[in-house]
Curated annotation (Swiss-Prot):
Disulfide feature: none
Compartments reported by the entry: Cytoplasmic vesicle, COPII-coated vesicle membrane; Endoplasmic reticulum membrane; Nucleus, Nuclear pore complex
SMART domains given in the database record: WD40
Membrane topology designation: Peripheral membrane protein
Record's protein name: Protein transport protein sec13
Annotated GO MF terms: structural molecule activity
Native source organism of the sequence: Aspergillus niger (strain ATCC MYA-4892 / CBS 513.88 / FGSC A1513)
UniProt cross-references to InterPro entries, sorted A to Z: G-protein_beta_WD-40_rep, Sec13/Seh1_fam, WD40/YVTN_repeat-like_dom_sf, WD40_repeat_dom_sf, WD40_rpt
Gene label: sec13
Length: 308
């Protein structure tokens, strides 16, 4: 596995997040220095093309929207704001040429740090979910050239992380009798040690807490819903309690979740699935990344340690 290191990031303080766009040609980074930097990646080389300024505190998270909505980046910060940035292409026939970045939306209804932002699967629409230390989740939607929002209480002691389920329900691709089409659901992780699953009700136009998953004994730092849409749903959660839990639900009994616990020697910060949804990457306080995979018996095994 080749690693490319960007040593001259240009940030003045700690970098908190980095994300590649859909095509792997742009990298966005964000930092305690209150800025976001956009790099163009070509092979082994990279070039800083833009520095975005607008936040008044450390920027925790950056997330690229699907390119069908344009070149759009969301960011969230300690300042309680979610900002949406868009690149305006000068030359419509050659988007690679790049254009000017502008802030197109400033969402500032949260009363504390916004810790994470996550775009929904593009099939569901241009939807951004935001997790805040004020205990609330907001969902922003861009439709008919304007932004609307919903905001609701989720976890009493603050929301640390949020992750959308795939748009297709598990088993729907291989079922002879598929259920309804696009689902809008996500999972949140909180400082109350809980995971909560939220489902959108199109009749009431609200997100409702349909399931609460208990098992961690300390803050849930990160949650990640696997993109796999085969016969099972998987959610991974990383906690301050030095464990990762992998929660599994079978398509034949979608309301029933079981969990398997993976134990570590350090607090855990992030969990991330491979694009196919069968390999889980875990990172924690020891600056190591480990990769995990389910064996034929349904047990999760470590397949690799990645150390710099």
């Amino acid at each position: 596995m080749a690693a490319q290191v960007i040593s001259n990031s240009g940030h003045d303080e700690m970098i908190h997040d980095a994300g590649l766009d859909y095509y792997g040609r742009r990298l966005a980074t964000c930092s305690s220095d209150k800025t976001i930097k956009i790099f163009e990646i070509e092979g082994e080389t990279h070039r800083l093309i833009e520095t975005l300024k607008g936040h008044e505190g450390a920027v925790w998270c950056v997330a690229w929207a699907h390119p069908k909505f344009g070149t759009i980046l969301a960011s969230s910060s300690y300042d309680g704001k979610v900002l949406i940035w868009r690149e305006q292409h000068q030359n419509a026939t050659s988007p690679v040429a790049g254009g000017a970045w502008t802030k197109v939306f400033d969402f500032s209804l949260h009363t504390a740090s916004v810790n994470m932002v996550s775009w929904a699967p593009h099939e569901s629409g241009c939807l951004l979910a935001c997790a805040s230390s004020d205990g609330h989740v907001s969902v922003l939607e861009f439709r008919d050239n304007s932004w609307t929002h919903q905001i609701f209480h989720a976890h009493g002691m603050g929301v640390n992380s949020i992750s959308w389920a795939p748009a297709a329900a598990p088993g729907s691709l291989i079922s002879s009798n598929p259920g309804p089409g696009q689902q809008r659901r996500f999972v949140t992780g909180g400082s109350d040690n809980l995971l909560k699953i939220w489902d959108y009700n199109p009749e009431t136009k609200t997100y409702n807490n349909t399931q609460t998953l208990e098992g961690h004994s300390d803050w849930v730092r990160d949650v990640a819903w696997s993109p796999s849409v085969l016969s099972k749903s998987y959610i991974a959660s990383a906690s301050q309690d030095k464990t990762v839990r992998i929660w599994t639900s079978d398509a034949s009994n979608p309301g029933q979740w079981t969990s398997q616990q993976l134990e570590f020697d350090t607090v855990l910060w992030r969990v991330s699935w491979s694009p196919s949804g069968n390999i889980l990457a875990v990172s924690g306080g020891d600056n190591k990344v480990s990769l995990w995979k389910e064996n034929l018996k349904g047990q999760w095994e470590k397949v690799k340690d990645i150390e710099e």
